Protein backbone atom coordinates (compact mmCIF):
# COMPACT_ATOMS: atom_id res chain seq x y z
CA UNK A 1 0.00 0.00 0.00
CA UNK A 2 1.34 3.43 -0.98
CA UNK A 3 0.73 6.61 0.94
CA UNK A 4 1.20 10.06 -0.52
CA UNK A 5 -0.24 13.54 -0.24
CA UNK A 6 -2.96 14.94 -2.45
CA UNK A 7 -1.47 18.33 -3.25
CA UNK A 8 -2.59 20.31 -6.29
CA UNK A 9 0.43 22.60 -6.52
CA UNK A 10 1.87 25.62 -4.77
CA UNK A 11 0.14 27.03 -1.68
CA UNK A 12 -2.09 29.39 -3.69
CA UNK A 13 -3.49 26.47 -5.68
CA UNK A 14 -4.48 24.41 -2.64
CA UNK A 15 -6.16 27.42 -1.11
CA UNK A 16 -8.21 28.02 -4.28
CA UNK A 17 -9.07 24.38 -4.94
CA UNK A 18 -9.60 23.00 -1.45
CA UNK A 19 -9.61 25.93 0.96
CA UNK A 20 -6.50 24.50 2.63
CA UNK A 21 -4.24 27.05 4.28
CA UNK A 22 -1.90 24.57 5.96
CA UNK A 23 1.19 23.35 4.13
CA UNK A 24 1.25 19.56 4.49
CA UNK A 25 4.04 18.76 2.04
CA UNK A 26 6.86 18.86 4.62
CA UNK A 27 5.25 16.09 6.66
CA UNK A 28 4.94 13.76 3.67
CA UNK A 29 8.37 14.65 2.30
CA UNK A 30 9.89 13.69 5.65
CA UNK A 31 8.14 10.35 6.18
CA UNK A 32 7.30 9.23 2.62
CA UNK A 33 9.90 10.90 0.40
CA UNK A 34 9.74 8.30 -2.36
CA UNK A 35 6.01 8.34 -3.13
CA UNK A 36 5.57 11.92 -4.28
CA UNK A 37 2.50 14.10 -4.50
CA UNK A 38 -0.50 13.70 -6.77
CA UNK A 39 -2.68 16.62 -7.74
CA UNK A 40 -5.91 17.42 -9.54
CA UNK A 41 -6.06 20.22 -12.08
CA UNK A 42 -9.03 22.56 -11.77
CA UNK A 43 -9.93 25.44 -14.13
CA UNK A 44 -10.02 28.01 -11.31
CA UNK A 45 -6.30 27.59 -10.62
CA UNK A 46 -4.94 26.45 -13.98
CA UNK A 47 -2.77 29.56 -14.36
CA UNK A 48 -0.48 28.16 -11.62
CA UNK A 49 0.17 24.83 -13.38
CA UNK A 50 3.63 25.56 -14.80
CA UNK A 51 4.81 27.30 -11.64
CA UNK A 52 3.60 24.39 -9.48
CA UNK A 53 5.36 21.71 -11.51
CA UNK A 54 8.59 23.70 -11.69
CA UNK A 55 8.40 24.28 -7.91
CA UNK A 56 8.06 20.58 -7.09
CA UNK A 57 10.62 19.41 -9.65
CA UNK A 58 13.33 22.00 -9.03
CA UNK A 59 12.87 23.65 -5.63
CA UNK A 60 11.52 20.70 -3.64
CA UNK A 61 13.01 17.90 -5.76
CA UNK A 62 9.91 15.91 -4.85
CA UNK A 63 7.99 13.74 -7.36
CA UNK A 64 4.77 15.40 -8.51
CA UNK A 65 2.07 14.36 -10.94
CA UNK A 66 -1.20 16.02 -11.88
CA UNK A 67 -4.19 15.31 -14.10
CA UNK A 68 -7.45 17.01 -14.99
CA UNK A 69 -10.23 16.26 -12.53
CA UNK A 70 -13.20 14.22 -13.75
CA UNK A 71 -16.37 16.27 -14.01
CA UNK A 72 -14.65 19.66 -13.90
CA UNK A 73 -16.22 22.13 -16.34
CA UNK A 74 -13.83 23.94 -18.68
CA UNK A 75 -15.02 26.94 -20.65
CA UNK A 76 -13.15 28.63 -23.50
CA UNK A 77 -11.27 31.03 -21.21
CA UNK A 78 -10.02 28.25 -18.93
CA UNK A 79 -9.03 26.10 -21.92
CA UNK A 80 -7.00 28.99 -23.35
CA UNK A 81 -5.19 29.37 -20.02
CA UNK A 82 -4.48 25.64 -20.03
CA UNK A 83 -2.98 25.86 -23.52
CA UNK A 84 -0.65 28.66 -22.44
CA UNK A 85 0.48 26.71 -19.35
CA UNK A 86 1.07 23.51 -21.32
CA UNK A 87 3.07 25.47 -23.88
CA UNK A 88 5.38 26.67 -21.12
CA UNK A 89 5.65 23.12 -19.81
CA UNK A 90 6.49 21.72 -23.26
CA UNK A 91 9.54 23.95 -23.57
CA UNK A 92 10.52 23.31 -19.95
CA UNK A 93 10.34 19.52 -20.28
CA UNK A 94 12.30 19.47 -23.53
CA UNK A 95 15.05 21.57 -21.93
CA UNK A 96 14.99 19.35 -18.82
CA UNK A 97 14.63 15.75 -20.11
CA UNK A 98 15.51 14.31 -16.69
CA UNK A 99 12.07 15.31 -15.40
CA UNK A 100 9.14 12.96 -15.95
CA UNK A 101 6.26 14.05 -18.15
CA UNK A 102 3.19 14.65 -15.94
CA UNK A 103 -0.14 12.97 -16.63
CA UNK A 104 -1.69 16.25 -17.74
CA UNK A 105 -0.07 15.30 -21.06
CA UNK A 106 -1.48 12.35 -23.00
CA UNK A 107 1.25 9.72 -23.35
CA UNK A 108 -0.18 7.59 -26.19
CA UNK A 109 -1.43 9.48 -29.24
CA UNK A 110 -1.21 6.57 -31.67
CA UNK A 111 -4.95 5.82 -31.57
CA UNK A 112 -6.03 9.29 -32.68
CA UNK A 113 -8.35 8.97 -35.66
CA UNK A 114 -8.87 5.24 -35.05
CA UNK A 115 -12.24 3.58 -34.92
CA UNK A 116 -13.70 3.55 -31.42
CA UNK A 117 -13.39 0.20 -29.69
CA UNK A 118 -16.69 -1.66 -29.82
CA UNK A 119 -15.92 -4.49 -27.45
CA UNK A 120 -18.52 -5.74 -24.93
CA UNK A 121 -15.68 -7.01 -22.73
CA UNK A 122 -14.04 -3.59 -22.46
CA UNK A 123 -14.60 -2.49 -18.87
CA UNK A 124 -13.77 0.70 -17.07
CA UNK A 125 -10.76 0.72 -14.75
CA UNK A 126 -13.05 0.33 -11.75
CA UNK A 127 -13.40 -3.34 -12.64
CA UNK A 128 -9.74 -4.16 -13.08
CA UNK A 129 -9.02 -5.39 -9.58
CA UNK A 130 -8.72 -2.07 -7.80
CA UNK A 131 -10.41 -1.26 -4.50
CA UNK A 132 -11.11 1.83 -2.42
CA UNK A 133 -12.65 2.00 1.03
CA UNK A 134 -15.00 4.55 2.55
CA UNK A 135 -14.64 5.63 6.18
CA UNK A 136 -17.27 3.05 7.18
CA UNK A 137 -15.08 0.26 5.77
CA UNK A 138 -17.30 -0.51 2.77
CA UNK A 139 -15.34 -1.45 -0.35
CA UNK A 140 -15.89 0.11 -3.77
CA UNK A 141 -14.14 -0.70 -7.03
CA UNK A 142 -13.40 2.95 -7.83
CA UNK A 143 -13.40 6.27 -5.98
CA UNK A 144 -15.87 7.68 -8.51
CA UNK A 145 -18.45 5.10 -7.41
CA UNK A 146 -18.46 6.13 -3.75
CA UNK A 147 -21.41 7.83 -1.96
CA UNK A 148 -19.42 11.07 -1.91
CA UNK A 149 -19.92 11.23 -5.69
CA UNK A 150 -23.38 9.76 -6.25
CA UNK A 151 -25.05 9.79 -2.87
CA UNK A 152 -25.59 6.62 -0.84
CA UNK A 153 -28.68 5.22 -2.60
CA UNK A 154 -27.40 5.71 -6.15
CA UNK A 155 -23.92 4.51 -5.23
CA UNK A 156 -25.27 1.23 -3.83
CA UNK A 157 -27.41 0.77 -6.94
CA UNK A 158 -24.48 1.25 -9.32
CA UNK A 159 -22.12 -0.94 -7.30
CA UNK A 160 -24.63 -3.79 -7.33
CA UNK A 161 -24.24 -4.08 -11.11
CA UNK A 162 -22.21 -7.10 -12.19
CA UNK A 163 -19.86 -4.82 -14.05
CA UNK A 164 -19.91 -1.23 -15.16
CA UNK A 165 -19.18 -0.99 -18.86
CA UNK A 166 -17.34 1.82 -20.53
CA UNK A 167 -19.64 2.61 -23.42
CA UNK A 168 -18.72 5.01 -26.18
CA UNK A 169 -21.01 7.99 -26.20
CA UNK A 170 -24.00 8.08 -28.49
CA UNK A 171 -23.95 11.89 -28.70
CA UNK A 172 -23.74 13.03 -32.33
CA UNK A 173 -20.83 15.38 -31.58
CA UNK A 174 -18.87 12.49 -30.09
CA UNK A 175 -19.56 9.96 -32.83
CA UNK A 176 -17.88 12.17 -35.45
CA UNK A 177 -14.96 13.25 -33.24
CA UNK A 178 -11.59 11.80 -34.37
CA UNK A 179 -10.49 11.68 -30.73
CA UNK A 180 -13.29 9.32 -29.68
CA UNK A 181 -11.04 6.26 -29.44
CA UNK A 182 -8.89 7.94 -26.78
CA UNK A 183 -11.53 10.09 -25.09
CA UNK A 184 -11.31 9.74 -21.28
CA UNK A 185 -14.94 8.74 -20.93
CA UNK A 186 -15.85 7.50 -17.44
CA UNK A 187 -19.16 5.61 -17.07
CA UNK A 188 -19.55 6.72 -13.47
CA UNK A 189 -19.23 10.39 -14.47
CA UNK A 190 -21.58 9.78 -17.39
CA UNK A 191 -24.23 8.51 -14.99
CA UNK A 192 -23.68 11.42 -12.61
CA UNK A 193 -23.80 14.21 -15.17
CA UNK A 194 -25.85 12.74 -18.03
CA UNK A 195 -28.01 10.15 -16.26
CA UNK A 196 -26.80 7.17 -18.29
CA UNK A 197 -23.46 5.49 -18.98
CA UNK A 198 -23.65 5.88 -22.77
CA UNK A 199 -23.92 9.67 -22.90
CA UNK A 200 -20.64 11.46 -22.46
CA UNK A 201 -19.99 13.58 -19.40
CA UNK A 202 -16.76 14.62 -21.10
CA UNK A 203 -18.79 16.46 -23.74
CA UNK A 204 -20.33 18.77 -21.14
CA UNK A 205 -17.35 19.05 -18.77
CA UNK A 206 -13.72 18.48 -19.80
CA UNK A 207 -14.05 18.30 -23.60
CA UNK A 208 -12.44 21.68 -24.32
CA UNK A 209 -9.57 20.90 -21.95
CA UNK A 210 -9.11 17.41 -23.45
CA UNK A 211 -8.75 18.86 -26.95
CA UNK A 212 -6.12 21.29 -25.67
CA UNK A 213 -4.35 18.34 -24.02
CA UNK A 214 -4.31 16.52 -27.35
CA UNK A 215 -2.90 19.50 -29.23
CA UNK A 216 -0.18 20.27 -26.70
CA UNK A 217 0.71 16.59 -26.16
CA UNK A 218 1.27 16.30 -29.91
CA UNK A 219 3.38 19.46 -29.83
CA UNK A 220 5.48 18.08 -26.95
CA UNK A 221 6.00 14.77 -28.73
CA UNK A 222 7.17 16.55 -31.88
CA UNK A 223 9.60 18.71 -29.87
CA UNK A 224 10.90 15.78 -27.86
CA UNK A 225 11.72 13.57 -30.85
CA UNK A 226 12.68 16.23 -33.40
CA UNK A 227 16.43 15.92 -32.87
CA UNK A 228 16.15 12.15 -32.50
CA UNK A 229 14.60 11.89 -35.95
CA UNK A 230 16.88 14.47 -37.58
CA UNK A 231 19.91 12.43 -36.51
CA UNK A 232 18.65 9.62 -38.71
CA UNK A 233 18.65 7.07 -35.91
CA UNK A 234 16.52 3.97 -36.06
CA UNK A 235 13.16 5.14 -34.81
CA UNK A 236 11.20 2.68 -32.62
CA UNK A 237 7.75 1.75 -33.88
CA UNK A 238 5.98 3.34 -30.89
CA UNK A 239 7.66 6.66 -31.74
CA UNK A 240 6.58 6.40 -35.38
CA UNK A 241 3.02 5.52 -34.38
CA UNK A 242 2.83 8.47 -32.01
CA UNK A 243 4.41 10.81 -34.55
CA UNK A 244 1.75 9.79 -37.03
CA UNK A 245 -0.94 10.44 -34.43
CA UNK A 246 0.67 13.77 -33.52
CA UNK A 247 0.73 14.84 -37.16
CA UNK A 248 -2.96 14.03 -37.55
CA UNK A 249 -3.81 15.93 -34.37
CA UNK A 250 -1.88 19.05 -35.37
CA UNK A 251 -3.57 19.04 -38.78
CA UNK A 252 -7.03 18.70 -37.18
CA UNK A 253 -6.77 21.33 -34.46
CA UNK A 254 -10.50 22.07 -34.51
CA UNK A 255 -11.20 18.34 -34.05
Show where each model-derived region lies.
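C-terminal accessory region of radical SAM enzymes
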Residues: 84-115, 138-185, 189, 193, ...
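Short loop/turn segments at secondary-structure transitions that flank enzyme active sites
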Residues: 9-11, 43, 70-72, 139, ...
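Radical SAM enzyme core and accessory elements
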Residues: 172-255
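Long, K/E/R/D-enriched contiguous segments that form extended
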Residues: 50-120
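Radical SAM/AdoMet-radical enzyme domain recognition
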Residues: 1-76
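Short, acidic, Ser/Thr-enriched surface-loop or helix-capping motifs
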Residues: 134
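Short, small/polar residue-rich loop motifs at catalytic or cofactor-binding pockets
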Residues: 124-128
Amino acid sequence: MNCGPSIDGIAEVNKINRGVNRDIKDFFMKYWPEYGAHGTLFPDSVEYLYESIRYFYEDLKYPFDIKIGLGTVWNEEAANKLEKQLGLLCNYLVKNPKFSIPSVFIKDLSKFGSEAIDDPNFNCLGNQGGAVYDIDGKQYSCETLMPLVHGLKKSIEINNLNRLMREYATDAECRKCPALAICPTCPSMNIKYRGTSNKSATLTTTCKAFKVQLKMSAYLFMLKYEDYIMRGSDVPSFVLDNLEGSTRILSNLSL
